[in-house]
Amino acid sequence: VFGEVHRVFGADAAGADHQRHELLTALCIGYETALRAGTALMATSPTYHASGGFSAIGVVCAGARLLDFDAATFRHALGIAEYFSARCPMMRVVLAPTMLRDAHGAGAFTGLNALLMAMEGVTGAPAETVEDASVAEHWNDLGQRWEIDSQYFKPWPVCRWAQPALTAMLELQRIDPGLTADAIETLRVETFYESMCLQGHTPQDADQAQYALAFPLAALIVRGRLGPDEVTGAAIHAADILALSRRIEVVEAADLSARFPGEILSRLTVTRKDGSQVVSPITAARGDPATALTALELEHKFDLFAARLGQEHAQAVKQAVRQLARAPSAIVALEPLFQASDRSVP
């Protein structure tokens, strides 16, 4: 597979426009079809699945385009990918956070494996979450409506379901800059059930800190920002963050649970040390389509998250992406993305 993909993207300059278009087309195909496979899976299963449970479908769709599969081979690859995909029960990792995360690696592996097997003639059709009549509504408007346009960019490196509470807190602090850790006695988070399950007041490792609500909220308030350094390493055991985290209560609100998963929402009640209270409105996460991050905010997020690459490497990655449209070779242009960092990560 990798050799064939390199053949597609390693063309000479005369084919540069074609290969750049193919790269972006394949990316769009992969994301769009994986998202639709996800909505189909969620609609036909009582379990809330992590994205690794359906992303293999997107890998196959993108790969089949690049490798010019015929219809029969493509169909079998989809069936193989679906059949071998991981189960990925999301709530298990929420309730017991580990390095399994959202199983992105499993989805990528399964998709690539399905492409290889189908190329060798292995059969596997049909993929029920693509072909079954019960999921037709998730595929009928393909090419007319884009699921990609309904997606989001997380401002912070923690679970998606914690983001509304973080957004609400920043808005309260924008209105009242005096709402600092020293001024807060207690903080009550009302949210939907799945978000309530995050809890996470005293994490013991980075996985627990990032699949949490109380701790990252406390870290944001205490440190004034929430990046990788606030949910890894020494910060996890920082006394000032933990002191506030222990004063945060996370509870389910029935009205917000009723609106999930169509909306993910939270509201906060902050009690100051003088006894006064401030209540946030019901708040959606920053970075959703209706509250999209600006290009500058996305670049700032990249700079914060890529700091451990070193400035030179991080800038090379940004430059590679910006210049892709003018590059003679997509593979060569994107080399900085795949280079290992020479900086050690603590």
Locations of regions flagged by a protein language model:
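Alpha-helical support elements that line or immediately flank enzyme active sites
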Residues: 1-22, 55-69, 159-177, 221, ...
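Glycine-rich, mobile lid/loop segments that gate access to catalytic sites or pores
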Residues: 7-107, 113
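Terminal-appendage/accessory-domain detector
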Residues: 92, 96-109, 116-346
